[in-house]
């Protein structure tokens, strides 16, 4: 673990050397492969200090962070090309990655809180510094206020836990059970906003639409997983409360997931559609997680990792069209089958992954989640069937509207994709489909 953290620390000065953009990118790839070979598949903490360590649960998410961050640099080639403060951009991404690695590998609840909140700052800089429209200021304010409003109660909750148990270590707190309503809400709300749960999701589509492609990738890929990861960690000692209140969150998530799917069906903005579909997916993750069944926890973890790769890839595809056509509107992104025939393959593969078609990791996650939610209450089948149906519906809508139909007449010439873009898509799609062969790693952590 320490070698990763020091590696990232020493990568920060490299960002300021001229023409080192691709060097940093290759270095991040390199470190993600090193980390891939570091797995021990043992369900204990490999500790490096009193508050940093890594177990199977954090391993997958740290790997996802390293992978997505190296792909972010691959996707943001235009920043390098037009020299849009690229040194600061690199620095921003490396610091963000460092904070994320520290978040996922902290064993102390307070350290987790510290890095959890501080990873917001580089994300905000990404949106405000490299976003496209002037409305990005509003998106930044939304992002900041939604998250910070609930983070103070969480801090108070953490100190209460510290006061009662005398420890903040995740492993030592598993022996305790709290039966205190206020603590439950304090600790849970911060993660619900970060997930985001329906009703507190409004910052997400806004942030996605205004963010540059790298901001969208990190937001969809990792930031949404922070909430799920935090829940998986704290749900252990909040079990008694959760049995009492979980029906509220599960109902909101399932109904909200269906409503979000319906909202997806009337989007004209490519990025907004993918953002709203993220809310629907994270709704089912949240519902499965709060059932507190074995299948539910494993399924939520699986779907979190799968969704990180899948929606990140879709945002990259939307950006490829945006760079060619200068618009994200579905009225202009039509008939892309004529425009970029080879990209249609990637559109299809990633859209089908979003629908949870086999052999993707999404399928495994969704089947486990459906199992767990139905075992919690069979009435939820009503909402789940709608959710599955509309999920397929809006994905097909996204695919068919953007790829088929007449080409928009304002498009001058057809253009093929660059090798860089095909590589980017392949590196999103390949782990998504190969991880199903190593699916026991999504279960072993529990």
From Swiss-Prot:
Provide the protein's localization: Mitochondrion membrane
Disulfide pairings = none
Q: Where does the sequence pass through the membrane?
A: 4-24, 56-76, 93-113, 114-134, 141-161, 182-202, 212-232, 245-265, 272-292, 297-317, 330-350, 373-393, 426-446
Q: What is its EC number?
A: 7.1.1.2
Please provide one cellular component term from the Gene Ontology annotations of this protein: respiratory chain complex I
Gene Ontology MF term list: NADH dehydrogenase (ubiquinone) activity; ubiquinone binding
- Family membership, please give it: Belongs to the complex I subunit 4 family.
Name of encoding gene: mt:ND4
Give the Pfam families listed for this entry.
Oxidored_q5_N, Proton_antipo_M
Quote the protein name from its UniProt record.
NADH-ubiquinone oxidoreductase chain 4
Q: How does it sit in the membrane?
A: Multi-pass membrane protein
Q: Which transformation does this protein catalyse, written as a reaction?
A: a ubiquinone + NADH + 5 H(+)(in) = a ubiquinol + NAD(+) + 4 H(+)(out)
Please tell me the species this chain comes from: Drosophila yakuba (Fruit fly)
| Superkingdom of origin organism | Eukaryota
